[in-house]
Amino acid sequence: NHHVGADSLQKLGSEAHNYYRDGFYAASQDAELKCPDVELNVLISIDDVTDRVQAVITPGTKPEEAFAARRRVMAEIEQESLAATGLRSDVITLYQGGRYHLYRSKKYTDVRLVFAPEQQIAFFGGDADNFEFPRYALDACFFRAYENDKPARVPHHLAWSETRVAAGDLVFVSGHPGHTDRAATVRELESKRDRTIPFALAMLNRLEVLYGAYGAEGPEEKRQALGDLFGAQNGRKSREGVLAGLLDPAVFARKRQTEARLRDLLARDAGDKPSPFERIERAEDEIARVSLRHNLLEGAVGFNSQYFANARTILRAAQEATKPTGDRLREYRDSNRASLEQQLFSTKPIYDAFEIVKLADSLTFLATALGPDDPTVKQVLAGKSPRERAAELIRGTRLGTRAPDAAAAPVTDLRRPLYDGGMAAVAASNDPLILLAQAIDEEARSLRKTVETAGEIKRQAHAEIAQAVFASAGEDRYPDATFTLRLAYGTVLGYDQDGRMIEPITTYAGLFARAAAKHDTPPFDLPPRWQRLRQALEHDQPFLETPFNFVSTADIIGGNSGSPVVNPRGELVGLIFDGNIQSLVLDLAYDDTKARAVSVDAAGILAALRQVYKAEALVAELRGPAAAAAAAAADWRPLFDGRSLAGWKPTPFGGEGEVRIVAGAIEIAQGSDMSGITWGGEFPRQHYEISLDARRVDGSDFFCGLTFPVGDDPCSLIVGGWGGGVVGLSSIDGLDAANNDTTHYHAFTTGEWYAVRVRVTPERIECFINDERVVDQPLAGHALSIRDEVIPSKPLGIATYATTAQLKNIRWRPVAPPTSAAESAP
């Protein structure tokens, strides 16, 4: 997504090149921009290591000892895997401790920017439309992964679909949902409702105001702050949605009912020992006792600066390096070193003025939350105001890549020598932020230990609950989200909102209508490039009708951004970028009544690349060699010149109506009963598409009965039959269009033109009305035929039944066969 790639756009950009605002396109690989500190991971394997992890915990082990033992064995597993495979290795906790799995991933760290749209079209509608639908956002970027300075060659990839999604389609989503609390206890949800979310909202509301005010100082300040502002707004709105669910009495009523059943199940074997639920409640009490200070000090909410983050990383890397890898804080294990170093040594420019504003505000938050007389606050502020102290710290540090400043002398970056020098270099350092990180480190570590120990108590309790559930109901219930790969499925489906039906698919026509309705005022204004092309685009009917965004019932949550949406053939049809406001309750429980995942449509992405950004090379690459070959051969070939019946002749049905040319169209007058035209020239039998526009002028039955060859067999597409509304193929396995699986009903308006298109390959027949797929009929195992009265239309003909119809734009084009068996596989 653009909003995921935004961090890279900000890091690559400058005052002169604002890629976040203005977009970017590399017309060749040489022009691609290398992104600082980006790491892409591709999952290779998953191994169950539950028995090995749980074996180190024996009955009676104290929680802090159990936590240390578990940390050691997980580090051992990760280190052994890294040494054996060279792959990134992470032990993941599932079911809150019921299962442990080892995930191995191939890592790419040379990642380059290929394309990004302007921020205004990627986030059209801004915060007002965020978590809403209908949406009109081109929230997509393209990056290329490299190995050994060459584009990575991968054995598997998703093909870009040539078919658009339609209402009712089945879709699948593979992605990394971040966190859910569906297995949380009532007490844990109460803590989230009463403590965790209110604290986060207080912080995010404050940051939203801060970043907005800083960005209002000028265009460069706006560029620096825009990504952080979006993050604050998005975080605020998402938590408000979760909080609304937690404040719903019905949600807690259902949760209490579920928990009561689990308590009864566990009580049978509990004896006199505290139940898992009671142990979780005590652990929550302990976390609540230290929560505020933990968030401010260990969570660094009170120290909002990239320079401070670098200082803490350098300090703790030196401290932890003196310990065996299994005894270290998790982020400093040997198996995580490469990722840590990539982040620490980012070349992203840091803007001192912005850092001072952020740090001053967070120090103010620290002082007001703990009180000005708190010993830690006094030590941190060192007798100065938050603003003065922030300026002193930022101007005195040398722990980052400073953005160029003509008024300031160059400053040597000390991150690498301090990191490589270990404890001796850190102990000798007088960098003010190293000294600050040292000053709060003992208390911060103590707070972390308290929370981790309580977390271990909860983990063991949840493991008992999970084992009880496994024993009684099996492992059919999937675990809460953990930022690891999950597969979800759903249907492209609208929903009712306040008595109004929300259709599941938006188009580019809707984008322009939305902008016009809002008088093109921010955040509903279009970027300059789109404004320049607007008049032409608004007269391009195929572009206007192209799907832009769509919703589905797929089970997603924060973290799914950028997840591919695929059809049953494994082809990419969209990209998840949001959920509607009703989807935020999915943190607590899945419900498909109104909750929807929001995607940008793959067809909409291609249309923008082709017609707005003129990125033909990228389009050809995305569609793949087979599709590119098809596109190269996709010049439509006319079957009607608009002036004569050349190549066509009236079909001798008997009782047929007159055929004539009227205003550039073929008019087939109503007969008794069938009338039509038959093609007398050459026509392919496979690998082709045929397209035409048809309309009913008078009558009440089918106005387009298109008979076409499928290899050696004929078939007919009936449009508007059996009283005027049936669409389908005649015949499949001896059953006509009204009685087989292709039967589809459509409300056709007399006098209105409809675009009819049929694609024939050896594998299937696909039929489209106004570019909406209405038939997708596989051929394997099925017999094709036509009704006896239609035989005069063979091999290619168009007929009507008791209806006057007009036809125009009759044409065909070849469809290139797959270039290999692998490419033809579904």
Where are these regions (language model features)?
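Terminal presequence/propeptide segments associated with secretion/organelle targeting
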Residues: 1-630
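Carbohydrate-interacting regions of secretory-pathway proteins
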Residues: 630-826
